[in-house]
A protein has these predicted regions:
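Conserved helicase motor core of P-loop NTPases
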Residues: 1-114, 119-136
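C-terminal accessory regions
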Residues: 109-113, 117, 122-136, 141-245
Length: 245
């Protein structure tokens, strides 16, 4: 299914996207939206880019709450329940079995993991069933998970990817970012049931037919474009091949 929701300003675009994610899609499609809504943007920057949208979505879906731990790191605020993405391969992260008691984790309105963790590379000379769980390492670029624990005094976090938990120390947090909204560049190779894409003014180097095609083809069930028709027209007519973010 395909829908286009015209909006004039970037503020209207971002407000509509938050409403779609938080209320309209879950109300209409129910459980089909669990783990399945992904916002894909041309750029990180701007009022409808990933950085601003993720701040809005964190406030709407996983707000500050008594008993819900949070920790600041540079310009980011991480909170238990946040949806996050690993941004580069790191083979030094240690894994542990996910023994999180779901009743003990404050549940935001959407803590869907989205794309699961890729399997870590096999250690040479070992079969997988011979390797102790505590020794399996590695988290990979594009993996999406949910923060399940934050130890503020120790400056560490635990992030659940599928059925295991990765332990993050403070020196690893540069490689973690919020993932309710991601760039088209970061979405490559993934698929999602529902894709929402803002159509807002960005660099013409980014507003290309190839980028629009890549974003739209990430959707398995539904695509919703939100914004200005003129931006869609620009992207369709711009046949540049490079795609950066």
């Amino acid at each position: 299914d395909f829908f286009f929701l015209p909006r004039r300003t970037d503020a209207e675009i971002s407000a509509t996207i938050v409403e779609l994610y938080k209320t309209r899609l879950p109300r209409t499609y129910g459980q089909l939206t669990e783990n399945g809504i992904q916002i894909i943007t041309p750029s990180r920057r701007g009022e409808a880019g990933t950085e601003h949208l993720n701040r809005l979505l964190q406030a709407a879906l996983n707000p500050a709450e008594r008993g819900r731990a949070e920790m600041s790191f540079r310009d980011k605020l991480f909170r238990v329940g946040d949806r996050v993405m690993q941004t580069r391969n790191n083979y030094d992260v240690l894994w542990e079995d996910d023994e999180t008691d779901e009743a003990d984790v404050p549940e935001p309105e959407d803590v869907s993991p989205g794309r699961g963790r890729a399997r870590p590379p096999q250690v040479a000379g070992r079969e997988w069933d011979e390797e102790p769980e505590s020794e399996r390492g590695g988290v990979f670029n594009g993996d999406i998970g949910v923060i399940v624990d934050i130890d503020v005094p120790e400056r560490t976090m635990r992030v659940r990817f599928d059925d295991r938990v990765a332990i993050y120390t403070s020196d690893m947090l540069d490689d973690l970012e919020h993932a309710w909204a991601v760039t088209v560049h970061k979405s490559q190779g993934s698929e999602y049931p529902f894709v929402i894409m803002p159509m807002y003014s960005a660099s013409t180097l980014l507003l290309t037919r190839n980028l629009l095609y890549t974003a739209v083809t990430r959707a398995q069930r539904m695509v919703i474009l939100v914004g200005r028709e003129s931006v869609i027209r620009t992207m369709v007519e711009n046949n540049r091949q490079s795609m950066r973010y």
